Structures are given as C-alpha cells and as structure tokens.
Amino acid sequence: MAKISKRRQAFAAKVDRQKLYAIEDALALVKECASAKFDESIDVAVQLGIDAKKSDQVVRGSVVLPAGTGKSVRVAVFAQGEKAEQARAAGAEIVGMEDLAEQIKAGQMDFDIVIASPDTMRIVGTLGQILGPRGLMPNPKVGTVTPDVATAVKNAKAGQVQFRVDKAGIIHATIGRASFEAAALRSNLSALIEALQKAKPATSKGVYLRKVALSSTMGVGLRVDQATLAAQ
C-alpha cells in the first residue's frame, strides 16, 4: 500500500490541479501515470450544467466507442423465436425467457449487460429489484429494450457504453485502457462528448459542458481544456 501511495504522490506532483491541459498532453500524462501491474482503465468525468434533481434534466444514453472499451462483454438477451436466434447469431452468450428470469432470481448472473425485446418486458419487469440496483435493468433510453436485439448485441460487443448523470450532475465513463494509443482514446472521448451534446436537455440553461477531467484507475485526475477537444 505504501508503494502505491508513493507512486500516486509522485504523479500528483506532476499534475497541476489548476491547469487546463490540452487533450494531447492530458492523454499522455494520464497514460504515463497508469503504471500499475494491470491494464488500468482510462476514465472521464464530465460536469454538466444541469439540475440533476429535475426529472426533465436527467441525462442518460449510450454510445458505441469507435475504438472499443478493451473489455470483453458477456451479453444476456430476453427474446424468443426468430429474435432469439438472431441474438445468438449476433454473439449473445445467454438467451432465454422464463428460464433466464429464474436463473437471475437464483443469483446466477454471469453477464455484463441485459438486452430485451419489447414483448418480453412482462417477464423482465418482475426483475427490477434485482437488475436495477446493479445497473443491469434494460431501458429503451440506452438501447437495451429494442425490437432489433441483434444490433443491440453487436453494439454491446463493439464497445457500447451507457452513461447516466449522477446526483451531482456528473457523467462518469470509461473510454478505454492505458494500453490504447492516444489517438484511440481521443476518438472514444470525442464520441462520448458528441453523445452528451445530443442528449442535452432542452431545459438546460447556460454552459452545458462545464468541466472535463481524465484519470486512470490508480492515477490522479486532471482537467482538460475543452477548446482542444474540437481541434483535429
């Protein structure tokens, strides 16, 4: 633990908390700080100019990161008949109906995301207290309740991430791994920012994207100069 603390202190000394870093410099520094023995995730926190307490200003959605997430995802799908076959063909590890619901009730949840065809919500709806707290409840706003389950499965496998603003008005998301090239991380960040812009509530006033910060799993956070995000 002492070693981790010393390393963190060393990296913290390199970071100016008051400075806005150009995106290229920010990514380079975050990657440098990610020196743990595992492939650290690169995370972003975006402070939004919204009132998260108001239901009409809750920002939620999903985006497929062009360079993926660097994580293997196991997908469970509620579907039957032709849609079930399409889900399997698209790469879903688990496909079912009542049988899948019973597995979930029994605590057997060997998956990272749940997708449901609209006609299965009578079954899925009974699982809200189990899936909801785990962030696994299918929702049309993030594309996990859809008649096109095959595309939803492909998107999940391709690196789709879901986002939802927290009570403090902040979006937290992972945009890749420390092993990614800086260009790949930047591409993923740009895709996320674009998705957040599209999800801007009509009732949001003033500056919408207030702050953008990057960090690695074990590293320190640093702020990004948003003016450099648009530059290519």
Curated annotation (Swiss-Prot):
Chain's gene name: rplA
An example Gene Ontology biological process: translation
Gene Ontology, cellular component aspect: cytosolic large ribosomal subunit
InterPro entries for this protein: Ribosom_uL1_bac-type, Ribosomal_uL1, Ribosomal_uL1-like, Ribosomal_uL1/biogenesis, Ribosomal_uL1_3-a/b-sand, Ribosomal_uL1_CS
Pfam entry (one): Ribosomal_L1
Residues that span the membrane, as ranges: none
Sorted UniProt keywords: Repressor, Ribonucleoprotein, Ribosomal protein, RNA-binding, rRNA-binding, Translation regulation, tRNA-binding
Matches recorded under SUPFAM superfamilies: Ribosomal protein L1
PANTHER family xrefs: 54S RIBOSOMAL PROTEIN L1, MITOCHONDRIAL, LARGE RIBOSOMAL SUBUNIT PROTEIN UL1M
A molecular function GO annotation: structural constituent of ribosome
Role, per record: Binds directly to 23S rRNA. The L1 stalk is quite mobile in the ribosome, and is involved in E site tRNA release.
Self-association and partners: Part of the 50S ribosomal subunit.
Record-given protein name: Large ribosomal subunit protein uL1
UniProt similarity note: Belongs to the universal ribosomal protein uL1 family.
Superkingdom, natural source: Bacteria
